Each structure stands twice: as C-alpha cells, then as structure tokens.
C-alpha cells in the first residue's frame, strides 16, 4: 500500500480553504460522482467514482481520510485557479486535518474510485480509554497499518479463506469492506455468530469492541478500518 508522504501529493488531493461560507457538499453539487454510504454525528462515508473524462463541481470536504480503490490520473483545480495533475496509485491512503475546497477531473483512461471518511466531529478525547489489545500487534499477518498520525490509524485487513485473528480490541472505528465473504465473530464470553457480508459493506462503531474473527468462507475478505483517535468510545 502507498502511504501519504509526499507534500506535493497532499496538496493535490486535499487543498485548504479558509472559507466561512456555507459548505458546498460534494454529494449535493455532484451527485453523479459522490454517493453517501453512511452519515452520522461523527463521520460521513462517501463512495467517489470518476469515469474517464468525468469532472465534479467545486466543493468542500470536512477533515478527511481517503483510500484509493482504483487509482488513475487526476487534475485538481483550486479556488484561485491553480491546477495540479498527478498519477495516483491504487491503494494510496491519506489524511487531511483541515477543511478543503477543490474541483477534480479524471484525465486518465480508467475509472478512479475512492472511499472518503469525512470527520465531522474532531474534538480531542477528554479522558483515557486505557490500553487496548491492538489487532496489528496480536495478528500482524492479518492487520497492516498503512497510515497513522495523531488523528487516525488506517488498517488494511486481509483474511484468507480459513484464516482467523487473535482476540483483540477496537476503539471508535469506521470500516469499509473492499471484498466481502463469510465471517465468524467470537466474543470473550464464547458467543459465536456467523455472518455473510457483501462487497462494499460499511459501518461505524462507537464503543470498545473485543472479539476474534475468522474467515469461514471460500473467498478472501478484505477490509479497510479507520480508527478515530480523537473520538471517545461510548460507555455501554
């Protein structure tokens, strides 16, 4: 996976805007490009699809974490008329802490597809939630950290058929299933639940969860998890 480490590429994808006016929501000004998958008080998850030659309209984003499901060549125009072009690879992952305004066009020959997790509530955590059993530490063969900063941690999760992880914990997370399948979820009290999850499944958890997962199907399951470091879990 490609991490967001190049300043010029950060400027391309997430260019800052100091505007105080009413935000131009991408799903409202360009509904043919942006589809809302999930929206609550904390986050908004958007599926973004640019066909070759397709453009959106000038719009704003909350602070955002993004993952390129399908990369390509994009042109980004800023409110001041500045234009940038860049080849963005599949798997490219990034995060911006500021609100942004820009317009994007696919100037390549293939479809570009992006998952955006916009952070609507970014207040600092006011109290410690304690030390969690981190999945990437107890099951590094399943969980790979592809981006981490003070705000978020992004995990690439891959379960081969028959593969399971070890008991672990999550804080506040948002997740998107790149490739679904049949999973078995085991809780600390021994409760077991099987579930069929489709490609593109999306969700958000605001409590601390402790569990163990196993792929009991015949296909590889792949998930992207965004852990929110600045959101306190709700106490059950």
Give the residues covered by each predicted segment:
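Glycine- and acidic-residue-biased ligand/ion/polar-headgroup-sensing regions
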Residues: 61-79, 170-189
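Surface-exposed beta-loop interaction hotspot
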Residues: 118-140
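A short glycine-rich, His/Asp/Glu-containing loop-to-beta-strand
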Residues: 30-55, 66, 136-164, 175, ...
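Histidine-centered metal-chelating micro-motifs
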Residues: 53-56, 82, 94-105, 162-165, ...
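Ligand-binding loop in jelly-roll beta-barrel domains
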Residues: 71, 99-120, 207-231
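Short acidic-glycine-tyrosine-enriched beta hairpin
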Residues: 39, 80-98, 189-207
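Bacterial signal peptide processing site
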Residues: 17-19
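C-terminal motif of bacterial Sec signal peptides marking the signal peptidase cleavage site
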Residues: 12-15
């Amino acid at each position: 996976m490609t991490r967001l480490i190049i300043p010029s590429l950060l400027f391309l994808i997430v260019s800052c805007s100091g505007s105080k006016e009413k935000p131009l929501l991408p799903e409202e000004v360009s509904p043919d490009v942006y589809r809302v998958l999930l929206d609550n008080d904390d986050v908004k998850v958007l599926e973004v699809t640019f066909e070759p030659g397709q453009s959106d309209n000038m719009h704003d984003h909350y602070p955002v974490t993004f993952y390129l499901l399908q990369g390509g060549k994009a042109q980004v125009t800023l409110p001041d008329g500045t234009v940038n072009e860049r080849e963005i690879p599949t798997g490219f992952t990034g995060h911006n802490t500021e609100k942004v305004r820009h317009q994007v066009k696919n100037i390549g020959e293939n479809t570009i597809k992006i998952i955006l997790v916009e952070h609507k509530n970014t207040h600092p955590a006011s109290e410690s939630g304690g030390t969690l059993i981190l999945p990437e530490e107890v099951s590094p063969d399943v969980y790979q950290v592809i981006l981490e900063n003070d705000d978020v941690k992004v995990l690439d999760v891959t379960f081969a058929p028959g593969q399971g992880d070890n008991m672990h914990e999550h804080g506040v997370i948002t997740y998107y299933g790149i490739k679904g399948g049949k999973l078995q979820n085991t809780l600390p009290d021994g409760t077991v639940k099987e579930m069929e999850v489709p490609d593109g499944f999306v969700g958000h958890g605001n409590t601390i969860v402790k569990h163990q997962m196993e792929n009991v199907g015949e296909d590889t399951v792949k998930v992207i998890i965004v852990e929110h470091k600045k959101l306190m879990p709700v106490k059950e």
